[in-house]
């Protein structure tokens, strides 16, 4: 077997194992397998691995590491727009976690304007924007209730 075939088989094995870890919510184990896969984002597998790595860090509560992965992904050259868009949605979630609703909304609105693929990204963006609006309304109601007490 050639060296390149062995490398591809190893990557596929890591990918399958990482997906199994993610399904079982074993994010720490998934990080180990996703890290080497996420170095090459020009392929669909590598781009998904980069997103899943950032998402795994987010699930582990490592918000800074999740943000670093997303930001590095935005600097890498990839044609895998779906996984890049998913990463930017994750960046909005990171900002929500930090209670920076304004920035989260700006990421989502920019993505809504600029993303043109026919897939589930636009519906995810709409769901997130609706949820942000509901959060904003609930905060306003709470502030009014506190002011009247």
PLM feature spans:
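Acidic, polar-rich low-complexity tracts and alpha-helical solenoid repeat scaffolds
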Residues: 1-149
């Amino acid at each position: 077997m050639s060296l390149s075939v062995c490398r591809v088989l190893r990557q596929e094995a890591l990918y399958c194992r990482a997906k199994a870890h993610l399904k079982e919510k074993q994010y720490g184990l998934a990080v180990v397998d996703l890290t080497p896969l996420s170095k090459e984002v020009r392929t669909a597998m590598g781009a998904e691995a980069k997103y899943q790595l950032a998402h795994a860090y987010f699930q582990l509560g490592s918000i800074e590491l999740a943000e670093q992965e997303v930001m590095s992904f935005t600097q890498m050259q990839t044609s895998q727009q779906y996984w890049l868009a998913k990463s930017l949605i994750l960046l909005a979630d990171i900002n929500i976690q930090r209670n920076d609703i304004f920035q989260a909304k700006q990421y989502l609105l920019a993505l809504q304007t600029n993303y043109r693929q026919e897939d589930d990204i636009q519906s995810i963006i709409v769901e997130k924007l609706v949820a942000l609006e509901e959060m904003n309304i609930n905060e306003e109601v709470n502030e009014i209730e506190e002011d009247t007490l």
